[in-house]
Amino acid sequence: MFGRSRSWVGGGHSKSSRNIHSLDHLKYLYHVLTKNTTVTEQNRNLLVETIRSITEILIWGDQNDSSVFDFFLEKNMFVFFLNILRQKSGRYVCVQLLQTLNILFENISHETSLYYLLSNNYVNSIIVHKFDFSDEEIMAYYISFLKTLSLKLNNHTVHFFYNEHTNDFALYTEAIKFFNHPESMVRIAVRTITLNVYKVSLDNQAMLHYIRDKTAVPYFSNLVWFIGSHVIELDNCVQTDEEHRNRGKLSDLVAEHLDHLHYLNDILIINCEFLNDVLTDHLLNRLFLPLYVYSLENPDKGGERPKISLPVSLYLLSQVFLIIHHAPLVNSLAEVILNGDLSETYTKPAQDVPRSSAKPSIRCFIKPTETLERSLEMNKHKGKKRMQKRPNYKNVGEEEDEERGSAEDAQEDAEKTKEIEMVIMKLGKLSEVAAAGTSVQEQNTTDEEKSAATNSENAQWSRPFLDMVYHALDSPDDDYHALFVLCLLYAMSHNKGMDPEKLKRIQLPVPSEAEKTTYNHLLAERLIRIMNNAAQPDGRIRLATLELSCLLLKQQVLTSSGCVIKDVHLACLEGAREESVHLVRHFYKGEEIFLDMFEDEYRSMTIKPMNVEYLMMDASILLPPTGTPLTGIDFVKRLPCGDVEKTRRAIRVFFMLRSLSLQLRGEPETQLPLTREEDLIKTDDVLDLNNSDLIACTVITKDGGMVQRFLAVDIYQMSLVEPDVSRLGWGVVKFAGLLQDMQVTGVEDDSRALNITIHKPASSPHSKPFPILQATFVFSDHIRCIIAKQRLAKGRIQARRMKMQRIAALLDLPIQPTTEVLGFGLCSSSSSSQHLPFRFYEQCRRGSSDPTVQRSVFASVDKVPGFAVAQCINQHSSPSLSSPSPPFASGSPGGSGSTSHCDSGGSSSAPSATQSPADAPTTPEQPQPHLDQSVIGNEMDVNSKPSKNSSARSSEGETMHLSPSLLPAQQPTISLLYEDTADTLSVESLTIVPPVDPHSLRALSGISQLPTLPAADTETPAEGAVNPEPAEPTEH
């Protein structure tokens, strides 16, 4: 035999090189099979290779030669495959045979060839063969074989698998026996097979009745019990995982539950009415209501019936409403949660209706009395007995009519008993409640259940589940339960199958509702309370909870025509927003990291809004909120840890509440983001570069490219331009990048070169920034190189400082003025206009006339009012110090954009913890005075001699000692309103207003000299370089 095998392999090889895919070769292989009908250790390899070769020839013949299948069918070659299996030839031959059959059916494309293979019922014989399923490899190839066959199902091929005369459907019944297999890939394959069968059954009434009457109830009841067992295991995992040690197992259990729900939804989507009725009834009465919903009212696990904890119940119900949209199911479930008063009626399993009934009448989570395999076998034998009584298969339709009639009767009986189980308590229906109470007492219930049913009789309108939902929202300690409640409300309101009238009845938000005049005040107050708690320094509200609260509140009160929120609720919301402003003020710093965090958080919030579906896929939120990042939980789903994360959280809370406030008030967002794309220079823009500072350079990119460009520095950006050939003095932008994201370093061996890198802002705080420019800039000499480096470095500092000022304006903080533009002191009107950036002339002109500019009053201004007066008058009286207002003035919020240099000077006179010394512009060319020290000295002097003249002298001396770089640019006109009855200037008098009549202005004719300051406050001559024109002091 061994010699024959060697001869066949050798001869086959030489022949295969000539024509291995041919009818002649198939005849030769048939001859080999006839000579080796018994499997032995010596010939099993030969048989396996022969089967493989036959498969290759069949696949080739399917595309090229139909005579191959004629010969295969004529010689009945499938019998050899079946005989090999029945000989118990060992796992090796079984595995190879199943693998070969799987490949064969996967690659057959012509239906005629498929009919040849499926004829004579040999495939069904292989399906029902008793394989050793304890072998994982055999199990894998077997279920894969069934899955491949199910994919070939259609209206024609289904008759080869389903025999309506014998009431047998081996492909389906053998597959569903593995619905609870421990291997997840096997369970997934079973679901695919059943879905393929259900889709085909829509066009085959006989098969549909078989599935409904013989398999639906046993399969769905066992499936529901299997899902519920997983849910109880999930709940136990949550309850025992105090240290987040079982997160891997918990994630697997949550993923399994999601797979179950998607599978159930796929069955319901097929829209097979018979199946949907049976499945919906089993899900409601055997799983969702007794296990999920009943656990909401009484989460105590001490009772006889299985229950799960409140957070797990809310979490799973949210998943149900997010995934399943079958209207009868979700409306029945929502009716119980929103309006139902449940009277639980449990009986023993022996008192249940028969398992063959289409409707289980008792609402409880119990284990089926029989296994699925046993139930299928019993139904199969019952069908055979009936077939013996009715040998004529044409009478099958009559039998189905009788079964359908009995099923309808059972359905009517079940609907009658529903009044015993659940009563929707409405006004004027107390008789129903009393009837329900008496019927409940007649059941075999526990004393606890009887007392609960008796108490329900006395209530006209009892909604225990809805009350629990609202109660879970009102938890001041943390948001553990609140997050799940919000997800449940969101899922119910966004469910496509939900009846809007059910939600409107209790005034829950309906996103599709165009017009609304009222909303749920209780829910709105709970949501605003969550927002207020989130804005507290010690608040334990996670960002995900806050964002979901804002989303639900907007759904409640916003309509297409406006906002219907009550003034009292809007006032409470504004109070929460103010709290968030104070919270961010606590973390406001002059450091660079705050600006980066501020922009990153805004970018993250706008680019990645909350997706509730993804949120409910995360098993980590089932665990109590933790504050450590070591768990790997996303930042928005846990509490902050450390100052950096607390800063990020405070910024995000501020953004959310600010956005919500603006939307409810119908106002547009005009101040965020800090960098607007429409205001930036873009590639291929054509700019007027006349009178602009340009530095010629050679740009050498990382890949070795070399181009000639001109370097121009703008307020926020650096640009590389080339001359425009059509207009003299104009340039075309070839690259533009933000100064704040730039890094400049020198080149060690070349004093004329700089290494410049500009990074693109990261999409998330954890991602690595991507460099959009990484090149070496070579200038003509080292002087131009130094100038370029200085201009870029100062431009970067200036850009970041201006954005910090805009953040300060958002937070209503005093603004320290930026008095330099790119390092050039504003010494004269000509020099200032010459060095202003080329991009922002129009914005400067709009700054003082912008109608959006509001007035701002800083409380620290009145400490040294004479200082502000002297500075203002000096600036207005000296034309050499006038210049346009900074560009950020036009966009500043809350009045801070119109803040004059008087306001700025006054605010800087008081030391503030919110300002950083790094904000003061310091350059080697222009030494800065110690402004805080001199002001403190002036205040001490004023406090020791409380006279009007000393106040004026201290303020005048402060102006005398300011360097040119500290003199602010000209701002909108200052009006110091004068009252004859006032002794001193008030805070309200120092306000930016439009120009007033001359007689209302205080006239200052002279300024006296500053008295000598203590030695500790004296300044060097270089620090007092500016000597304003003397003026006569005024008296009030």
UniProtKB/Swiss-Prot annotation:
Ranges for region Disordered: 375-416, 437-458, 876-967, 1008-1036
Superkingdom to which the source organism belongs: Eukaryota
Encoding gene, per UniProt annotation: Clec16a
Subcellular location(s) of the protein: Endosome membrane; Lysosome membrane
Compositional bias per record (Low complexity), positions renumbered to this chain: 877-891, 898-923, 943-954
Family note: Belongs to the CLEC16A/gop-1 family.
Keywords: Autophagy, Endosome, Lysosome, Membrane
One of the record's GO cellular component terms: endolysosome membrane
Subunit structure: Interacts with RNF41/NRDP1.
Any Pfam family: CLEC16A_C
Major site of localization recorded for this protein: membrane
Biased composition annotated in UniProt, kind: Basic residues: 381-392
Name the record gives this protein: Protein CLEC16A
Species of provenance: Mus musculus
Biological classification of the source: Eukaryota, Metazoa, Chordata, Craniata, Vertebrata
Gene Ontology biological process terms, A to Z: autophagy; negative regulation of mitophagy; negative regulation of proteasomal ubiquitin-dependent protein catabolic process; positive regulation of autophagosome maturation; proteasome-mediated ubiquitin-dependent protein catabolic process; protein destabilization; regulation of proteasomal ubiquitin-dependent protein catabolic process
Deletion phenotype: Mice with pancreatic specific deletion of Clec16a are significantly hyperglycemic and have reduced basal and blunted insulin release after glucose administration. Mutant mice have normal islet architecture and beta cell mass, but beta cells show accumulation of vacuolated structures and unhealthy mitochondria (rounded mitochondria with disordered and amorphous structure). Not associated with immune infiltration and insulitis.
Membrane topology: Peripheral membrane protein
PANTHER family: PROTEIN CLEC16A (PTHR21481:SF0)
